[in-house]
């Protein structure tokens, strides 16, 4: 079984940040392969979109694309870890316990962290409506799944999930930005989380539908007590 670690940098500063983050994890997994994707690795459509919408280099529309590209180049049942460049290790040399567990547990396809921040506050009404949910849905009362880092086991289920995530972002770009929602937002709405909002509701709706894909759900307390932490580094200046 192979293990690959990937990230993305939109410019020289973010590429350097991502390379350091990826290398720090590779130091724990000496036989792992790594790749930091750059704009040159993206199709023209995504790069052109990013020129018009610089936030998140096109509102993070590239994220499922690069994960899919990386998964397609590894073998069935190999493991891939995606992490944002600002993620980092709490302590050098200490294991990432949830990741080690996921690697050993063949029954799970995707490992994802569910935060304490409620979906209702961080997903706009248009995305909620696109998932055929209303503002009273129980799914909005639970924590949003983070797109900051997650692990993938290559198989048809994880690839189908990626294809669906990417297709939604490409086909519904206008509702995955920061424009005012055409549908009513929840009264506790604070701000949209774009690719993450879609990622989160995809996971939740598939769990409710008892879809064949299996998620290893990582809760905030467990994540924040582990060694791989989100937003550990500042944005480059």
Positions of PLM-derived features:
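Glycosyltransferase catalytic domains, chiefly GT-A lineage
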Residues: 1-237
């Amino acid at each position: 079984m192979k293990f690959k670690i990937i990230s993305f940098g939109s410019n020289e500063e973010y590429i350097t940040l991502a390379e350091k983050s990826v290398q720090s994890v590779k130091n724990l997994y000496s036989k792992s392969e790594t790749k930091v994707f750059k704009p040159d690795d993206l199709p023209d459509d995504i790069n052109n979109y990013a020129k018009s919408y610089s936030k998140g280099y096109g509102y993070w529309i590239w994220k499922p694309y690069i994960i899919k590209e990386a998964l397609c180049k590894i073998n069935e049942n190999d493991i891939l870890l995606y992490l944002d460049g600002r993620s980092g290790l709490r302590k050098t040399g200490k294991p990432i316990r949830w990741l080690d567990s996921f690697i050993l547990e063949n029954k799970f396809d995707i490992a994802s962290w569910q935060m304490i921040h409620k979906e209702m506050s961080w997903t706009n009404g248009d995305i909620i409506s696109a998932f055929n949910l209303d503002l009273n849905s129980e799914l909005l009362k639970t924590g949003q799944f983070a797109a900051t880092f997650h692990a993938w086991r290559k198989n048809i289920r994880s690839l189908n999930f990626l294809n669906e995530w990417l297709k939604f972002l490409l086909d519904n770009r206008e509702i995955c930005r920061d424009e005012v929602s055409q549908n009513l937002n929840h009264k506790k709405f604070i701000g949209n989380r774009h690719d993450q909002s879609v990622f989160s509701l995809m996971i939740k709706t598939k769990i409710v539908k008892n879809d064949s894909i299996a998620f290893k759900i990582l809760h905030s307390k467990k994540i924040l007590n582990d060694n791989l932490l989100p937003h550990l580094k500042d944005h480059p200046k």
